[in-house]
Each structure stands twice: as C-alpha cells, then as structure tokens.
Swiss-Prot record:
Gene: NOP9
Alphabetized SUPFAM superfamilies for the sequence: ARM repeat
Signal sequence bounds: none
Subcellular location: Nucleus, Nucleolus
Family: Belongs to the NOP9 family.
Pumilio repeat intervals: 108-143, 291-334, 382-419, 524-562, 563-600
SMART domains, sorted: Pumilio
Any single GO CC term annotated in Swiss-Prot or TrEMBL for this entry: 90S preribosome
Keyword rRNA-binding among UniProt keywords: no
Listed Basic residues bias regions: 1-15
Predominant cellular place of this UniProt entry's protein: nucleus
Annotated function: RNA-binding nucleolar protein required for pre-rRNA processing. Involved in production of 18S rRNA and assembly of small ribosomal subunit.
Record's protein name: Nucleolar protein 9
Amino acid sequence: MPRDKQKRGRRAEAKRKRDDVITDPTVLKRQKSSDVCNYPNPSYEQLEIRGDYIPLDEEPVDYTGTPFYGLLDIEEQEYFSHASGLLELNQFETEEEKSIFIERVYEEANGKELKIACSQSCSRLMEKLISASTVSQIKRLFSKFIGHFLNLVQHRFASHCCECLFIHAAQYVTSEMKKKSSKEKENLEEDSTSELQLEDLFLKAISELEGNWGYLLTERFASHTIRLLLLVLAGKPLRNPSTTTVIASRKKENLASKVGTQLDPSISEKRAVPTSFNKALEKMMKDLVAGLDNTYLRALATHPVGNPVLQLLLSVELSHMGKSKAKDPDSLLRRLVPDENLQGDGESAKFLKGLFYDPVGSRLLETIVQDAPGKFFKLFYKILVRERIGSFSRNEIAGHVVVRILERLSKDDLKSAMDMILPEVAPLVERSRLTVIKALIERGIVRGVDLGPLAAALLSAYGDDAVSRINNMLKLQRSNKESDGTTSSSNTSSPEQLHGSLLAQAMLKSTGPLSELVQSSLLAVTTETLISIAQDPVVSHVLQDALTLPTSTPQFRRQITSRFSGKIAELALHSSGSHVVDALWPATKDLLFVKQRFAEELVVHERALRDSFVGRAVWRNWSMDLYKRKRGSWIAIAKGLEDSTEINPNALTHKPKSNIDLARARFAAKANGSKEPS
C-alpha cells in the first residue's frame, strides 16, 4: 500500500526553530524561574514541557486576588496577647472597669481590625472582645468588616470572628426592631443617617456573598458562616443543642463563658426577625441551589462539608416556610426525592436507602424524618422502613435514624415496631448499642405502650443474677479496674458506660418491671459497690434517679437509704457523691428518723464540710444551720411542712384575728377616721 509523501527532517527542523528562540541557557533558566514564581499553577508550568502544545485562549490562574491585610508588629502582638489574657482571667473589680478596658482595646485596635481577625495569635482576642461588647461597639466593628466579608468568611481565623459577630449581633436585631416600632407609634423623628441599623448591616454582608454561594457551600470555613446566616435570617435558636452541632464542630470553644459574659436568653429561643430577613432568606436559599442539578444535590448529601448546609436548608424550608412547601416541585425535598410513591427500585427509594448506612448522609435522613410532612413520613415508613426496622436497628449508623423514626410513630405503629426489634435486643446489648432500646422505652412511656415484653427481653439479655446484671449494664467491673490502676484518667468514661447509664435512667422512669430490674440490682450489690456507684460521675445519675423519681416505692427507699449510714460525710465531700446526698433529702421525706441520723453525721463533720466547696453546698441544701439553731423548724421542713407557722411567719395573717388584734384595728380606724373593721 503506498505511503503518504512526507518531508524528511521535519523533527530536526522543529528542534532548530525552538533553539533559535532562546539560545542562552541562563535566560531560559531565569525565565522558567520567573514563570514559576508568577504563576504557581501546575497546569500552566507544563507549557514548557511539550513543544507542540497549542495553548487555549485563556489566561493563567491568578492567585494574587486574595487580599493581604498586613501583619501586626511585635509590640502590637504583645499588647493584644496581654489584653486577651486579661479578658480571659476576668478579674475586673467592677463592670465599669471592664467596659473601660474593652473600649481602650477597641481604640488601640482602630484601623487594625482586619489584621487582628486574620492573625493566628490575636483572632481569639477579637472573639473575646465581641463577646463582651455593647451594641454600639458591635455596630462599629460590623461596619469595619463591610466590604471584606467574602474574604473573611473563607479565612481560617477570621471566619470564627465573623461567626461570633453574627451571633452577638443577632440578639440585638429583635430589640432594635421593637424600638423602631415604638418610635414609629410615638411619631418621633430620628436621624437615620447617624448610624446604620444591624438589620441593614446584615443585609449588606449577605449582598457581598451573593454570586458565590455555590462555591462557599462546600468551602471548609465559609460553610460554617452560611449555616449561621441561615439560622439568623430564619430567627431560629442559635444556642440550641440541636443546632449547635450543625453550626460548628464539637471542638469549637465557647469563649463567651471564659470572658464571663451572658448571652441574651432570646438567643436560645426562636426570635422575631424583620420582614426584610424573610425576603433575604428566600433569595439566599434559592440562590444556594439555583445552579445545582439534582445529581449534585444528592452528592452533597454525603459530602462532609456540604451535608450540614443541606440539613439546615431542609430544616428551614420545612419548618420556617410551612409544610406545604414540600409539595412544590422546585422545593429542596422534592428535588432530592422527586418520586411521590417511593415504589420499587426507583431513584428516590435507592437514594433514601443508601442514606441509612452512610455516616454522613444518615444525618440528612434524620432531618428529613424529623421535619417532613406527615403524609410523606407515613409513606416513607410504610414502604421503606416498617418491614426492615429490625435490621436497621442492628446497624450502628442506621440505628440513629431509627431513633428519629420511633419519635414520630403512633401507638399502634410503635407497638408493631417494638415487636420487630425485640429479637435484636440481645445482640444490641452484647454490642452495647443501646440507643434504640432507650428510645423504645422513652416513646413507650409517652404513648402508653406495654413495655413488659421489652423488660423480659432485657432480663434475658442481661441475665437473672441481679449483681451481674447491674455490673454488665453500668460496666462497673471496668470502672473498678481503672480506679485500682495507676492511670490518672479517673474522670473519663467509656461510651459503653455512658450508654448503659442512660438506659438505666430510662428504665427507672417506667413503672413496672423495667424499673424493678434496676432497683432490685441496686439493692443486691454490696455497700462498697453502692458507694463506688455514688462516686462515679456517670453512673451516679442512676442512683440519683432511683432515689427521687416517682417510680421509687417507699419500700425501696427505706431499704436503699439505710445502706448509706456512716457514709454520708464521705459522700458529701465528693464531687459526684454530694449530688447523691442531695438526692437523699427528698428520698427520706417520709423517713424522718433516717434523715435525722444523716443530719447528725453531717454535724459531726461540720468543719470538714465548711472547708469544702461541695461540702458547703450539701450543708446549705440540708439546712444544717437551722438544724443546729431551731431543731423544731428543721423538723417541720424535713416533714414537708413549709406552710407551717414556725417556718412561714406570713401564715399568721391567714388565722382568725384575736381580740387584741381586733382592738388594735378599731383604734387605728378611729385615728384615721374610717369605719370600724368587721
């Protein structure tokens, strides 16, 4: 077959042309080094590798766009570090002295706010300052950050300052809104140009981030700020335990408690927000998912950074915008789960089934179960969960979703679900996966379901011997070995011991065989074991509940309280045991002779108790000063006679007036010229 006619020596000619461009090797070396310095982009550096490379009509990536706000000098760093230490110690004599100090730090930081926020060593000072600032200082700092939020929220240290600023500014938005409405009612004129409202500052900050939501959604640091902004605009609680883990990680430090400032209680409750926030929230939520297709949205469900944002978007959509929003085909729930019937091996059914076993996606599924409309939840439970709830409860990850499902079941569905889970109780107990069992007990108490079969399953799993049962449930043998060893981690507890303690506390809240399982075990152990339980920071809660809950019978309290004779002073001086001593006060409400015996033990060790912080608390809670001075009054309190005349002097006014009282009243009436009292 004839070949194509080709020109000989073409490779050599191409090589000569390349060599003619730069003949000096030093120039080539210098040019390469400058290129690497100017464009630190690996794909752009590869332009020098191949001579036949045809570049596209695009510019290399520019990494010089991120602004640099400068560095603090050594003197400034020392000053701000010293100020941070003083704020953390919080040893100011008066609040006025503290406010003067904070204002001076603000004056020193004037013009350096962005440097401090981006500083690794001084950004913590900025957070502490914000936590202790007044509303005017927060506004001033907020105004300094305006125009830089897009860069600050992506910064490792400045992003924490932005979050702290948003949290503390949010608590003043509602108060400003109330003041504004009251001034409008009084028709008072106000110079609106003097100072921007926090409402306007928030809207300006959000406008800076617009157009970048898709990237910030999965950005390592900015995603935390997006979650917080969603809560602020929706007026949802910012310090609620259910939302704290979604906003920030568990390693997030609470600097407000160290500075000694108290947040407004409204920050932990649902807040009223301006109407402009509702409009901004709808636009923000729409823009966040506008450029994302359904496939990418489902990929976010298992993304470790994007998943928490998706959780909040779903929660706000379903709770803040109403359940009817779920019917909208453009809603986030319908984009994730477009199929209405969830039948067969459809795309939506496969997606939801996959979330059960995913450590990240299961959290999104918990949010769907909690906030989804009732019609959707019933269909979801009937088709995907009801027949498989036993196998789901076996899995460590899917078990958390099962707990959320149990919280929404009716009485009949809960009874059938318990029947499906009962065969799995023994394996769950063996692996110390007790969250599903605990949820079954708690929901059974609420719904009024008979928990006798569950008690029988737990008895079979833990054994008939009462001592070994409580040892296995609370992991007492392991804690005793740790206390006897040389390790110093006595205050740490294993997750198995914590889950066992929570299960025992849930069992004690149920009347009948469940509480009797724990009570009989506590009576069967030795006194030394009982004292060790009382002194354990985790397990002692079981003993406190056993003494104080309404399920505690008089017979049980009479038997268990007598075991503490001679040990009251020892427990009162212990950080955990002192709470058990406090619980013994209501536990002996109908056992006055036992309570007096315990009080005598406390009197004997009065000096040691007064020298101890926890001992002084026990002395005060047991009213021991009254016991020493007025024994009769103390006995009246011990019997529960708080309304007696010996304790409450105001009770005399409710008694019939004596003759001398009537005479005094008549004399006073004559002096005042009024009628005689009848």
